[in-house]
């Protein structure tokens, strides 16, 4: 007995037919293509329009062109690179700033643009305040000033780059 039945909810007949045919999910991925269960044909069909979307999860294994501990740079096609942060809470620190600079270097030479975006739950929590706090507590003021300068220089590079750099929060 399923959850709906336990709560005295009626389950559609076609759901039982689907389960009887051995199909246990409304959605699946076959050969990298996302599919949905179609009631009329009683089979999976490709989700329409998905060729117009870029799903980073589909590119992670094959399209990485550069990576460090804080971010990855993917070729997303059409001469465009994508920078995806993967630091804790997608915070911005030295590694993510290095990735932004590296992606701009590559794009200005061999590509047409850069997108900074991800498909994580949170786009970015902002600056790595833990790192900033530790520098302040340790009284590493020169290093703190260098970190702030690196951030500012990188943001100016994003703004004035020779190629478009788009930040795409969600």
What are these regions (language model features)?
Residues 1-121, 129-163, 169-170:
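N-terminal glycine-rich phosphate-binding loop for ADP-containing cofactors
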């Amino acid at each position: 007995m399923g959850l709906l039945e336990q709560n005295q909810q009626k389950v559609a007949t076609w759901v039982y037919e689907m389960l009887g045919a051995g199909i246990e999910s409304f959605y699946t991925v076959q050969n990298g293509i996302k599919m949905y269960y179609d009631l009329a044909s009683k089979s999976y069909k490709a989700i329409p329009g998905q060729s117009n979307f870029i799903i980073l999860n589909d590119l992670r294994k094959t399209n990485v062109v550069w990576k460090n501990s804080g971010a990855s740079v993917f070729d997303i096609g059409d001469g465009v690179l994508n920078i995806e942060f993967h630091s804790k809470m997608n915070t911005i620190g030295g590694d993510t700033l290095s990735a932004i600079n590296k992606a701009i270097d590559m794009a200005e030479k061999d590509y047409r643009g850069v997108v900074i975006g991800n498909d994580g739950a949170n786009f970015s929590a902002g600056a790595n305040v833990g790192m900033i706090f530790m520098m302040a507590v340790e009284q590493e003021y020169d290093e703190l000033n260098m970190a702030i300068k690196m951030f500012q220089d990188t943001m100016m590079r994003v703004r004035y780059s020779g190629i478009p750099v788009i930040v795409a929060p969600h």
